Amino acid sequence: MQIWVDADACPKVVKEVLCRAATRTGLQITFVANHYVPVPTAPNIKSIQVESGFDVADDEIVRRSEAGDLVISGDIPLAAELIEKKVQVLNPRGELYTEATIKARLNIRDFMDTMRASGIQTGGPAALSQTDRREFANQLDRILAKVKKTI
């Protein structure tokens, strides 16, 4: 299993958790962004900088990821596309998107886009809380434990 990170909007604390997990497990992790993302010097941790542009990093993740990989992203349309490829998607708040939940998430996202387009101020997501950080780390550990059992 390879871990891919949609690093353009990934919180720093989540990146730190991921780097510690990669160091501990030896799994390959790749941060993909349209800007430079500094990563620790380790053979299994790398960063790919893609061109600037709408969804360029997302497209690179879709192109490179394979069934069984894990992607860290809060981008719901990207998650939907990856789930079709049988790629696991975990958001930075610790929610694992699934075939059963992604359609509802897409509908909510589209509804909020429609509201914003009509001039209604919907606000953005809340800042990442300590509970979110803990839930992300716990969910990541559960996923990695399952991978370890299959190796």
From Swiss-Prot:
Protein's name according to its UniProt entry: UPF0178 protein VSAL_I0701
Q: What CDD domains does the entry give?
A: PIN_YqxD-like
Q: Which family does it belong to?
A: Belongs to the UPF0178 family.
